[in-house]
Amino acid sequence: LAMADATGAELIPGLASILETEAPGVSIQVLPLTTRDPRPMLDDESADLAAGYFPAVLADLTARAQVGKAVAFAHQRLYEGAYVCVMRHGHPLASGPLTLNRFCAARHLLVSFSGRPFGFVDEALASQGRERRVVLTVNKFFTAGEVVTRSNLLTVLPRHFVNIAGANNELVQRELPFDIPAVQVATLWHSRLEHSSAHQWLRQAVTRAAHQAFEETPPA
């Protein structure tokens, strides 16, 4: 099972509870997901299931299916993620409105699995003819939270992650001063496993864990 740390923080507690009560003889290994395209690791069986935000992959699979091409992977929506801008308490931008100009003028940290300093936030800014200055990239959401609490950098994190990661008291959350596309978190798997009873159980367990997590996540 491959997923990023922010996704795992939300899903794994519920999944562990399901394992304990319903399948105590089952073992699951969670691998770090360091790509927005997990198809190679699913194809070579490095992972049986991936959970995360895969916009380009899902768009490609949908396009292939629409023109009648073979599609070797299946997917299922888990939840819609909301993202917020976060900064440390006492940050110069922590009081007062976070305007688009202030956001773009600040120094930013970006969570990037590839290390590329350009993500979906930057795509949204570019569509408005704007850009921000990314001075640091890391590949884990937990690391991003720790860095921001000890610096004047801004970062953009999943709202649910800030709420459950114990950083709520150390970070100030602000709504983004621009619109971003909906972030659809989904599971992805190779079609050869579609009818495997064990894999069907795993997919259902992950989906249930997601539903439980968002029912229990306190509002921001």
PLM feature spans:
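Hydrophobic hinge/microswitch elements
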Residues: T34-P38, D43-A47, Y53, F113-V172
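Residues at or immediately flanking beta-strands
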Residues: G25-Q29, R133-V135, V172, Q184-A186
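Flexible hinge/capping segments at coil-to-helix
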Residues: A65-H108, H190-R192
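Central regulatory/effector-binding core of bacterial HTH transcription factors
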Residues: L1-L61, V138
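A late-sequence structural motif
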Residues: L11, V84, A94, L100, ...
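Short, well-ordered beta-strand segments
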Residues: L1-A2, A50, V86, L109, ...
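Secondary-structure junction motif
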Residues: Y53, D60, M87, L93-L100, ...
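Beta-alpha-beta core module
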Residues: L61, G68-A82, F142-S191
